[in-house]
Amino acid sequence: MFGRRKSTEPKAMKQDTDSITELVRRSLDVAELKYTYSNATNHFSIVFMGDDLPINVNLVVDDLTIRFVSHLDLKAKPEKYKDVAWELNGINKRLRFGAFYLDPDDGMISFEYSFPYVEANPSTDFILAFMKMFVGTVDEHDGDLKNLAESVSASRNAMYG
């Protein structure tokens, strides 16, 4: 609470990586979603069908957060990076959460949001509702994004691009 003296005792984590990974797995199973899981990078990959394009979603569980990452199959040309970044900024300022970004190394556009679970108690319903909002946001803006960058087939790994 604001104004209260902070305790010098470290807070115990409510959740750990293994329990959150299992919660994500349970959530996907309850929703009967097809997914792949990588033990090496501790991430789940799911493909949703948007209005006109598939939406690849990766849920990456680390020691503090669940990262929702969608690497879009859209690539900007180097000479358009400045314009694309400006347009992405315009989209981002209207979003309630998350951000679209341009990778300057390869020109690919992605959308990402991280949920810090350390002091929270997320549920199956929360994971599924959050994923629905995440996918809905990507789907809502993919038309604008297709006007900024060209479509390519380049699905990337959530951890290593």
Go through the PLM ranges and name each one.
Residues V118-F130:
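A short acidic/glycine-rich loop-to-helix N-cap element
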Residues K146-G161:
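Short, highly charged C-terminal tails/helix-capping segments
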Residues M1-I55:
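Charge-rich, low-complexity N-terminal segments
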Residues T36-T41, V61, L102-D106:
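Short, ordered beta-strand-loop transition motifs
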Residues K132-G136:
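Long, contiguous binding/interaction regions
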Residues V69-E112:
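Short, internal acidic amphipathic alpha-helical interface segments
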Residues N42-F44, L64-I66, G107-I109:
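Hydrophobic residues embedded in beta-strands of well-ordered beta-sheets
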Residues I46-K82:
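Long, continuous compositionally biased terminal/linker segments
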